[in-house]
């Protein structure tokens, strides 16, 4: 025992007894966190991954419940008129007529907008309060990023959208499939009804970007970020892409999520990523309105050629903007973070176990992936053949 007493009369703890698997960084930590053991920390990290994966589950669950309720209400409203117009209809033909009316643009847009709005809000509430990982207001801090960087990111979005459209066009040319069912397309397309178009714009351009940034950059990415920022960026972008649940948007969603996550981490706030997300959706809706809704009625298929040219131009502009943005601000590193209350540092070997290895063992991640990819595969049987 005397060999372990140093010259100051203090007991020397052997180096092998030190908990070398983790250490705290210099950011503020949750109350009582210094008393956590390595085992508790690992459990805390893995719990965060499970809550990140559950965001899609809650969203899909509430969306499904909402759509069932909406369909029941809509059926009760239009069924009397269907029967009155043709009292000799059979049960099968009534169901077919009801389905046809429900699939029309206005009804589908209203159902999709209202149900997804409610589903996103409820998913955010549950995951935020149940996970208890960080403070909500930290996500909305003032962006620590120059406005020129946000402008470059917004322009970079044009490049991502242009690239995605070119890839989708190539796939459609080779396979004949557009990648999106008529029902999904009608839920995201303009109609001749002004009120419906306003609802569509408010949801797609305003509500969806705000709520999705809270869900995937504010919650999911932060829940995935305590060990490695780059891992959190890629994993949250993967979840964001899967959330769209159709192959036409999964790829685009992943790339868009990477850029939005990058700008959120670099600026330390989801306000900047919200701005860029609004720009992305507004750009897509504007081009859709001009080329697919207005010009298509006057110049026919030439409108789609012009739309293709517009996206090709955006690819060039956005590509240049992304190049300068990445050159100026560099890659994501451990100093990039949105919230400061939930961060750990691990040795490299332990870090590998607590990133992809841990996420791939998360049941909520796999259930979410199966649901979203299953929906995308199911849509392949319903897509419009070009």
Predicted regions and their residues:
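N-terminal, membrane-interfacial amphipathic/helix-forming hydrophobic leader that caps
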Residues: 1-142, 284-386
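Contiguous mid-protein beta-loop-alpha structural module that forms a pocket-lining wall or clamp
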Residues: 224, 232-286, 294
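Hydrophobic alpha-helical membrane-insertion segments
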Residues: 56-75, 151-167, 265, 271-279, ...
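Hydrophobic core segments of transmembrane alpha-helices in multi-pass, intramembrane catalytic enzymes
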Residues: 116-123, 200-204, 253-257, 318
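Juxtamembrane helix-loop-helix connectors linking adjacent transmembrane helices
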Residues: 83-84, 88, 97, 105-108, ...
């Amino acid at each position: 025992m005397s060999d372990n007493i140093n010259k100051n009369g203090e007991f020397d703890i052997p180096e092998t007894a030190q908990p070398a698997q983790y250490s705290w960084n210099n950011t503020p930590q949750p109350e009582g966190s210094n008393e956590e053991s390595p085992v508790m920390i690992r459990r805390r990290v893995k719990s965060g991954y499970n809550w990140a994966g559950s965001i899609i589950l809650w969203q899909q669950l509430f969306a499904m419940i909402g759509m069932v309720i909406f369909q029941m209400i809509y059926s009760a409203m239009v069924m009397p008129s269907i029967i009155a117009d043709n009292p000799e209809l059979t049960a099968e033909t009534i169901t077919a007529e009801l389905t046809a009316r429900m699939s029309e643009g206005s009804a589908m847009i209203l159902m999709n907008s209202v149900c997804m709005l409610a589903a996103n809000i409820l998913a955010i509430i549950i995951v935020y309060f149940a996970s208890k990982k960080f403070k909500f207001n930290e996500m909305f801090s003032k962006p620590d990023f120059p406005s020129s960087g946000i402008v470059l990111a917004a322009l970079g979005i044009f490049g991502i959208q242009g690239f995605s459209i070119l890839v989708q066009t190539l796939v459609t040319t080779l396979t004949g499939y557009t990648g999106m069912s008529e029902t999904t397309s009608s839920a995201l397309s303009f109609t001749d009804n002004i009120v419906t178009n306003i609802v569509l714009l408010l949801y797609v351009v305003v509500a969806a970007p705000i709520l999705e940034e809270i869900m995937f950059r504010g919650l999911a990415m932060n829940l995935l970020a305590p060990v490695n920022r780059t891992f959190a960026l890629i994993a949250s972008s993967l979840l964001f892409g899967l959330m769209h649940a159709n192959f036409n948007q999964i790829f685009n969603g992943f790339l868009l999520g990477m850029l939005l996550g990058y700008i959120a981490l670099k600026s330390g706030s989801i306000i900047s990523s919200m701005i860029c997300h609004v720009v992305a959706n507004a750009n897509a809706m504007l081009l859709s309105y001009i080329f697919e809704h207005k010009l298509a009625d006057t110049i026919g298929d030439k409108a789609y050629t012009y739309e293709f040219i517009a996206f090709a131009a955006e690819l060039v502009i956005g590509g240049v903007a992304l190049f300068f943005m990445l050159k100026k601000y560099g890659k994501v590193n451990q100093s990039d973070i949105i919230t400061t209350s939930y961060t750990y540092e691990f040795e490299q070997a332990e870090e590998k176990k607590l990133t992809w290895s841990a996420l791939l063992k998360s049941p909520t991640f796999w259930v979410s992936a199966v649901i979203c990819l299953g929906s995308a595969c199911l849509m392949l049987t319903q897509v419009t053949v070009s």
